[in-house]
Amino acid sequence: MNDQQFEQSDIRSQKANMMNSLTSRSIKRTLPIWLDNSFKSLLIVVMVFSISLARAAEPIIQEPTFSNEVVRVLQEKCQRCHQPGGIGPMPLETYEQARAWAPRIKENVRRRIMPPWHLDPTIGIQEYKNDFSLSEEQIQILVAWADNGAPEGDPADLPLPAEWPNWLEWELEPDLGTPDMVFESGPIAVRAEGGDFWPSIDVEWPALEKPRYLKAAEIRNTIKGRGALHHNNIRLDLEEGPSGRVVGAGAGKRWDYFGEDTGILFDVGPGVVNFGAHYFPIGVEFEDNIEVAFWFHPEDDPPETVASVEIHHLIDQFDPGQPRARDILIPPHGTQTMYRTWVLDEPVMLNSYRGHMHLHGIAMSIEVIWPGRVRDYYGPGANRRDVIASINNYNHNWQTSFVFADDARPILPAGTAIVMRTHFDNTENNPLSIDPDQWVVFGGRSVDAMSHFHVSVTYLEKDEYDSLLLTRLNQLSKRK
């Protein structure tokens, strides 16, 4: 076994141990009342944005086989991670590989632990560009296959093997071509022992000839580094023009693709690209290197929609009157709910969002409270407030950006209040709560608590808002 194979095997072993610890214990985490069934808002004000509610039950295939139905589900939703050298703890490409894990596959998909898409499928908008969750039919296929003894079926039914990019290459390159710009952090010394640490590295951003619009960005690092890097955020700080976080990477996520009609404005600069990383020692001393690649829209074909860099909302820094400068103070065997409200000064279209918590975080949500004139316009039947997204099964080990489908992006008028809630669980019901006997306070370590929301919006002029709203209303009327 060569060094690369050993490193990949070691990372898969770590992931397998983590998976075993997560799935061998009962997960009965205490959800707050605002995510309980009795308080689920179904977005009655559907005229303001497109919505698809809970997926309807689909016909169940009674006797699925690996060669026919199962492998096609695995290729579509699982093998991107579960392949040799991938971050999944085991490959799931062949019958022999999948058969050995059939009971675990059944349990994880039934409980929606895998694939790691942590949205509640019964609340809010369900249309996303990057949705890799399983449909109800796909879940039933995998569950029925395991219940029937995981039959192989006829190998003649097998599709061609899926082809995946090498994990040491850019995942987006086969679709988008060679990156337009690539930046490197340079060597980062990762120690074998000790506590977490957070290197912050600035690399010069050269002045551009003209502003460009970002179409996609991707982060990659070394194989060993993937086992020790919790997350890395790339920030662009320009002397003039928009600055902020552009892309983040964590377990299971290394790129953001904004689409053919959406882009983030990169002004000419100059400035710096900041690599903000979070490492935790894994018992091996090594040298890491982080790279970020940028793909731009063509200079002569700018996107229709200009998205903002990520707007960083600190939910854990809402009320300075709390006992700490940051509010998080979770008692032993207790829970805590926090929120932050963002009142819009101008109309916006919400493009994407991602939440960030640590081990004690279990749920997050985004709710909108409509301004009075919107309620008056749509009449007394309109809801006053609606939950547009509920991350009801948050998992600290996955850092996911949820990118709305183009026709599902919420269009919100000025005066709308966006309420971002987070919930922490420091009880024995949370398998990631390492020691429920201890108080938990704010901190950067994974064993401390933190609560952030990152959102990307497009700011709209009044005429743009009116035009988009009219277009959306016409689209909805055609669906009826």
Q: Predicted regions span which residues?
A:
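Residue-level detector of intrinsically disordered terminal segments
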Residues: N17-M18, V46, I234
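His-enriched metal-coordination microenvironments in redox/metal-binding proteins
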Residues: N166-T458, D463, R472-K480
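N-terminal non-cleavable signal-anchor helices
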Residues: R12, V46-F49, I61, G248
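N-terminal secretory signal peptides that target proteins for export/translocation
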Residues: M1-N37
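Aromatic- and Gly/Pro-enriched helix-to-coil junctions and flexible linker segments
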Residues: R55-W205, E209-R212, A216, I223, ...
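Bacterial N-terminal signal peptides
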Residues: S38-S50
